[in-house]
Regions:
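N-terminal helix-turn-helix DNA-binding module of bacterial transcription factors
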Residues: 1-62, 200
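Short, conserved glycine- and acidic-residue-centered signature motifs
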Residues: 2, 31-34, 69, 76, ...
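Bacterial carbohydrate/catabolite-sensing allosteric modules
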Residues: 12, 44, 85-90, 108-117, ...
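Short beta-strand segments enriched in small/hydrophobic residues
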Residues: 12, 17-22, 57-72, 174, ...
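Amphipathic helical "hinge" segments at domain boundaries
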Residues: 36, 45-123, 200-203, 207
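Short secondary-structure boundary segments
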Residues: 99, 125-128, 150, 187
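Active-site-adjacent beta->alpha loops and helix N-cap segments on the catalytic face
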Residues: 129-139
Length: 227
């Protein structure tokens, strides 16, 4: 279905595009009869404002972009739900884009957020060594940026992350105190900082509690359910 534009509305009504635009915005300097004519025809033809054009005029989108690596785990669902509750409660809209643990997809999603002129970005990067340039560009443009769970290297931005080293160490300590002796670490990909820190905590605990680290104590794994 063809999208109806302000220009087409103006031609049908015999008005200038600027008058139609102001009438649709409820400008009281436009006669009430004119505003009603414009509103009536816009409704009949199914006119919908172009969000990008509206954002350009106002300089704001009242929208926050959220970049996630996946949306199937309980952790991801909890985080997304929390973000939505907080932002919706403040009158903001949310655009969620999944990178599927692919840096190229993540880059495309970030470029999409730029085109939509989002007022902020919340992201969980899939690779700490990739897409730093576009994240820095977003920051340089003055767009608020917050990383959660993971953060890329050399990008100065707010972050909400877990101390994975300490968490891994204390988990090992708990298992040792419960009498466990054959403990195996399922390690994630090395390009994910969380995975590196968890492995570091595991190995530190092995040494502290007198375990001998051999090739069988660490099993490489991915980040999906299939892995």
């Amino acid at each position: 279905m063809k999208r109806i534009t302000i220009k087409e509305l103006a031609e049908r009504l015999g008005l200038s595009p600027s008058t139609v635009s102001r009438a649709l915005a409820g400008d009281r300097n436009i006669r009430r009869e004119t505003r009603e004519r414009v509103s009536r025809l816009a409704g009949e033809l199914g006119y919908r404002p172009n969000p990008v054009a509206v954002n350009l005029r106002s300089g704001r989108s009242n929208t926050v972009g959220v970049i996630v690596p996946e949306m199937v785990t309980p952790f991801a669902a909890t985080v997304i739900g929390g973000i939505q509750r907080v932002l919706y409660g403040r009158g903001l809209k949310v655009i969620i884009a999944q990178s599927d643990e692919n840096p190229q997809t993540e880059c495309g999603n970030l470029e999409l957020m730029e085109r939509f002129m989002v007022d902020g970005v919340i992201a969980c990067p899939c690779d700490a060594t990739r897409n730093g340039e576009i994240y820095r560009r977003i920051r340089q443009r003055g767009v608020p940026l917050v990383f959660y769970d993971r953060a890329p290297l050399r990008v100065d931005a707010s972050r909400v992350i877990v101390d994975d080293f300490a968490t891994s160490y204390f988990l090992m300590e708990h298992l040792v105190r419960r009498g466990c002796r054959r403990i195996v670490h399922l390690g994630g990909p090395a390009h994910i900082p969380n995975a590196r820190e968890r492995l570091r905590g595991f190995r530190y605990a092995l040494g502290k509690f007198g375990f001998v680290s051999d090739g069988r104590s660490v099993i490489p794994a991915g980040v999906t359910f299939d892995d």
